[in-house]
């Protein structure tokens, strides 16, 4: 009914504009990495709009990107606070593995590293993916060489569209961008009635 369309017009447009903006921005990032001759994939983060995570993550996939974890339940990501509270990378990964064994969970474990010592500890303990946090492109290249295919690699931390190519060329498997969902600009859309001159209002 016309009334229903008018009642939901703004809600529909708000969602379509935001999700289309996310998909468009993701496509722009991923296509630029492809055009640069790299195999690096674009990842989103959990920095999503409250209540709209699933829609926003679906928009990222539509745009050609990949989803990082959906929540705390489908992957273990050991960040700086986890590492510091545990007393180091070795302890953090070890305790995460023990948690999975104890609770019968088959979860991938990713560990953030901030320096070479933490990288060496992560490689020694073993995990599924290592995130290089705030590494320079040059250090990222060295880190990827040190990992030597033993696990997946990811770059993160203040990387933008203008600075991402050198990181991808350094050989990382993934680059994560919080901006895809927390700083995106919605597309300009409008809702117009077609053939309204033929309608009869009763």
Regions found by a protein language model. Name each.
Residues 161:
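Cys/His-rich Zn2+-binding cysteine-cluster or related metal-binding knuckle/ribbon modules and their
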Residues 1-112, 117-125, 129, 138-146, ...:
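Acidic/glycine-rich phosphate/pyrophosphate-binding loops and surrounding catalytic core
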Residues 179-202:
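Short, charged, intrinsically disordered terminal tails
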Residues 134, 157, 179-180:
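Short secondary-structure boundary segments
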């Amino acid at each position: 009914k016309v009334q229903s369309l008018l009642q939901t017009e703004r809600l529909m447009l708000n969602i379509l504009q935001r999700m289309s903006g996310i998909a468009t921005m993701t496509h722009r990032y991923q296509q630029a990495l492809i055009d640069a001759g790299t195999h690096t994939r674009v990842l989103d983060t959990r920095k999503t709009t409250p209540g709209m995570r699933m829609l926003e993550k679906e928009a990222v996939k539509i745009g050609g990107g990949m989803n990082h974890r959906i929540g705390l339940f489908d992957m273990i990501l050991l960040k700086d606070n986890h590492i510091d509270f545990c007393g180091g990378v070795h302890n953090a990964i070890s305790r995460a593995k023990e948690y999975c064994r104890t609770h019968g969970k088959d979860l991938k474990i990713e560990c953030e590293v901030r320096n070479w010592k933490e990288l060496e500890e992560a490689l020694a303990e073993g995990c599924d993916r290592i995130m290089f946090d705030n590494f320079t492109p040059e250090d990222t290249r060295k880190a990827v060489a040190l990992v030597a295919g033993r696990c997946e690699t990811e770059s993160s931390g203040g990387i933008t569209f203008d600075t991402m190519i050198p990181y991808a060329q350094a050989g990382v498997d993934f680059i994560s961008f919080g901006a895809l969902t927390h700083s995106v600009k919605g597309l300009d859309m409008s809702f117009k009635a077609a053939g309204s001159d033929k309608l009869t209002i009763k």
